[in-house]
């Protein structure tokens, strides 16, 4: 059973890493290099408009892409699950996981990425910013969905075959999961949904909490060695509970009261 999650805009290339941490190379670096070549030719103001960011952030990313190269190693790169630092990754908290948990996640967790396509937890990455929804014109079309085409789905199918699995747990955002083509995926997609209620109000998807909950579920799956989607219903971390009435088929709804 495989999982997909989104990356994060926030990065951490400063915190100490666990000692003896292994590192692997992303499988689609040739594709990443093609994107970096396109971005390297863009002026700071063009990057700012494309990514809808400030001049300061645009300048930072111009410098990043100017220095980006496919032949990189650990001194300048960092394992993906430790490099991303958003809400999902705070919930996952890889830094406090034991080596056995990381080893379990390595062939199962897939981080969708605008630049790298797919990253495993211990794949080395350089700092970057390139959201999947970016309308970056390229030889294959008008945006990154056109650029990646079926490539991400093909790679996921290869990993599903290697894992001997026919289940993909979707813990990614809609923006990122659009890069996967479910009709061509050799798996059934299961989608956990997290809703919170404050002071007895209606249950709603609250972005911060939902993202954190996705990371919590990834960590819980690693700790419990979850291999069946049916077992996902037992997830009960930080007050979430499975709600059968709100769920439907392969959409599993978890509710929490505040």
Swiss-Prot record:
GO terms for biological process: response to hydroperoxide. Pfam families: H2O2_YaaD (PF03883). Belongs to the UPF0246 family. GO terms for cellular component: cytosol. This is UPF0246 protein LHK_02295. InterPro entries: YaaA. The lineage of its organism: Bacteria, Pseudomonadati, Pseudomonadota, Betaproteobacteria, Neisseriales. It comes from the Bacteria. It comes from Laribacter hongkongensis (strain HLHK9).
């Amino acid at each position: 059973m495989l999982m997909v999650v989104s990356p994060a805009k926030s990065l951490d290339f400063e915190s100490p890493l666990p000692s003896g941490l292994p590192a692997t190379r992303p499988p689609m670096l040739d594709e990443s290099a093609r994107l970096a070549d396109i971005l390297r030719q863009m002026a700071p103001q063009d990057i700012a408009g494309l990514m809808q960011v400030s001049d300061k952030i645009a300048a930072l990313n111009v410098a990043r892409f100017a220095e980006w190269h496919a032949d990189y190693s650990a001194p300048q790169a960092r394992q993906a699950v430790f490099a991303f630092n958003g809400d999902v990754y705070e919930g996952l908290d890889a830094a406090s996981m034991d080596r056995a948990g990381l080893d379990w996640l390595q062939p199962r967790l897939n981080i969708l990425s605008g630049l790298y396509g797919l990253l495993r937890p211990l794949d080395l990455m350089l700092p970057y910013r390139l959201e999947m929804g970016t309308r970056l014109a390229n030889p294959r079309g008008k945006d990154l969905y056109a650029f990646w085409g079926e490539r991400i789905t093909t790679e996921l199918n290869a990993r599903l075959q290697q894992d001997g699995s026919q289940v993909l747990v979707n813990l990614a955002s809609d923006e990122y999961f659009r890069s996967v083509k479910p009709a061509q995926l050799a798996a059934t997609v299961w989608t956990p949904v997290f809703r919170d209620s404050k002071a007895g109000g209606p249950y709603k998807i609250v972005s911060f909490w939902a993202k954190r909950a996705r990371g919590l579920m990834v960590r819980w799956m690693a700790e419990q060695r979850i291999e069946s989607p049916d077992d996902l219903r037992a997830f009960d971390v930080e007050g979430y509970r499975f709600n059968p009435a709100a769920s439907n088929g392969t959409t599993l709804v978890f509710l929490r009261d505040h």
